[in-house]
Amino acid sequence: MIQVDKQLIRDLYDKAVVNPRLRQNMDLRNSPDDNGQRMLNALMPGTVVPIHRHPMSNETVICLSGKLVEVIYEEDDIAKDFPMGMDAQDVPSGRRLKESARYMLDPSLGNFGCVVPAGAWHTVQVLEPSVIFEVKDGKYGEDGSEIF
């Protein structure tokens, strides 16, 4: 059994602060074959979480400590009129993103978490050292996740 307590949170913070990525996760699955993903993630200010999405799963994010902003993006239509002889294949990614929502996660204010809809592009901005509990459907590496 794993008990999530103050000592575990402190240990995650201690590891995150010395990690070059400024974050540290702890896998809470029973085995790599689990059909769901459950983890704690300690995030330090300055960490960069690339904009990404999970096309086949919602992502539940609960902030256990700290303060961060979950930022949601939506795809913006690319230019509809291309110069003569060009089409959408000539646009590098064929898509752009625009910010559509921001959710402050701060348990001290009673804002504990959010559910990011399947397919929504998102990232986090860490305002102070934070630990989140994340849950997604599907096996790790097989859930269709992609980075923008």
Which role fits each region the language model picked out?
Residues 33-36, 44-48, 65-69, 75-78, ...:
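Short, charged/polar surface micro-motifs in flexible loops or helix N-caps
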Residues 3, 12, 77-78, 89-104, ...:
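Double-stranded beta-helix
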